[in-house]
Amino acid sequence: MRASAILAVVALIVGPRGAEAGAKEFHAVIDGSQAHPPNPSSARGIGHFTLNAEQTELAYSIEFESWVSNEVFSHIHVDAAGNNGQDAILHDLPNGSSKKGVFVLKEPFMLAALFNGFLYVNVHTLTYRQGEIAGYLLPGTPAEPATWGRLKALYSR
């Protein structure tokens, strides 16, 4: 809780990076190398996220493929660095290879965690109970030059 309080104070004092008016785009490239712990799964996914102008809701559209076994559940987590040394579930995602919905950012630390790269998607399966694939939410869209090569490599497997 202490880290959450610190992030909330920082967010209120200096504001999150990129907190200008208007909707913000985020993306996640999701695979086994980012799972906690990493694994050799061939499953992969991509997520598109839009933070509304009021910075209170994060709409998401996430697609997955090639799971090793059946999905058990999936979530949006805050990682240990953004939550006092412990990963925590912030939002449950619907089951299935296509996930659409809205995550309401109820606490200031959630917005700070989003802008500082501490939020990630994690998909748990029967084979990989701790998470078969995961991916951090990053600013921008996947077509930006910094991520396009990685996406191209991901989908050309």
Task: Annotate each PLM feature.
Residues 4-15:
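Bacterial N-terminal signal peptides
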Residues 16-74, 78-149, 157:
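Metal-centered catalytic cores of metalloenzymes
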